[in-house]
Curated annotation (Swiss-Prot):
4Fe-4S found in the keyword field: yes
Species for this entry: Staphylococcus aureus (strain Mu50 / ATCC 700699)
Top-level lineage group: Bacteria
The protein, known as: Epoxyqueuosine reductase QueH
A Pfam entry, by short name: QueH
Catalytic reaction equation(s): epoxyqueuosine(34) in tRNA + AH2 = queuosine(34) in tRNA + A + H2O
Length: 240
């Protein structure tokens, strides 16, 4: 399968536009009549909207919901259910066949990682976020190898609040550890973020007010009691 590294290496003396890298990679798939299988980490349904609309034109996608950073548990369950429901609705509306896979919810591992690295007091966007991105990219890469996918990647680059340059650099580093290719991206480019807002309205998708991290949420003054109450009320619609 085609590796993005040769494309990126030609841009080393400039700020890398990972949206262009992805489109060049897709061009190579098309020239070689390749339709790869991609295991795509998604942090939430909103970030997967435009991302799926774009990628399903060229590849077979499975959404991998691996987000043990989300707190509290009911909020995690709400976001997972919203993600699963969007995949079902997207498939029904478009005729796509996107799969939904949910990783184990293991928040103790995330908290331990943060405390072991002494990152609890980091500001959002700092080293704690870097460690969180790396942890989740590692999880999805490992799963991609186990399940035979050609690429692993993340929909999180759609968010204008997240550092796509950093996420892609981490993804390329993780790629070196596992026998699977990283899918570079910057999905917010080419009006991807604007399209995601339209799709959230079209599909009536819940948009959360914080990333999910308990440490960042406490810094922001998030009211966990209210979050938990609202999430619990939502989940009561799905008794199974």
């Amino acid at each position: 399968m085609i590796n993005a590294e040769p494309i990126i290496s030609k841009m080393k003396n400039q700020k890398i536009n990972y949206d262009k890298v992805l489109k060049k990679l897709i061009g190579q798939w098309e020239r070689e009549a390749i339709r790869p299988k991609i295991l795509l980490h998604s942090c939430c349904a909103p970030c997967s909207t435009y991302t799926l609309e774009f990628l399903t034109q060229y590849a077979d996608i499975a959404i991998y919901f691996a987000n043990s950073n989300i707190h509290p548990k009911n909020e995690y369950l709400r976001r997972a259910k919203v993600q699963e429901q969007f995949v079902e609705d997207f498939n029904r509306k478009t005729g796509a066949n996107v799969k939904y896979i949910e990783a184990p919810y293991e928040p103790h591992k995330f908290v331990k990682m943060v405390k072991d690295k002494e990152l609890a007091d980091e500001k959002e966007g700092g080293l704690r976020c870097t460690a969180c991105f790396e942890m989740r990219l590692d999880i999805v890469a490992k799963a991609a190898v186990e399940h035979g996918y050609d690429y692993f990647g993340s929909a999180i680059t759609l968010s204008p609040k997240k550092n796509a340059q950093l996420i892609n650099e981490l993804g390329m580093d993780v790629q070196k550890i596992y026998d699977v290719n990283y899918l570079p991206s910057d999905f917010k480019k080419s009006k991807g973020y604007e399209r995601s807002i339209e799709m959230c309205n079209d599909y009536n998708i819940f948009r959360q007010c914080y990333c999910g991290c308990v440490f960042a949420a406490m810094q922001q003054g998030i009211d966990f009691k209210t979050v938990n109450k609202e999430a619990k009320a939502f989940l009561e619609q799905y008794p199974d």
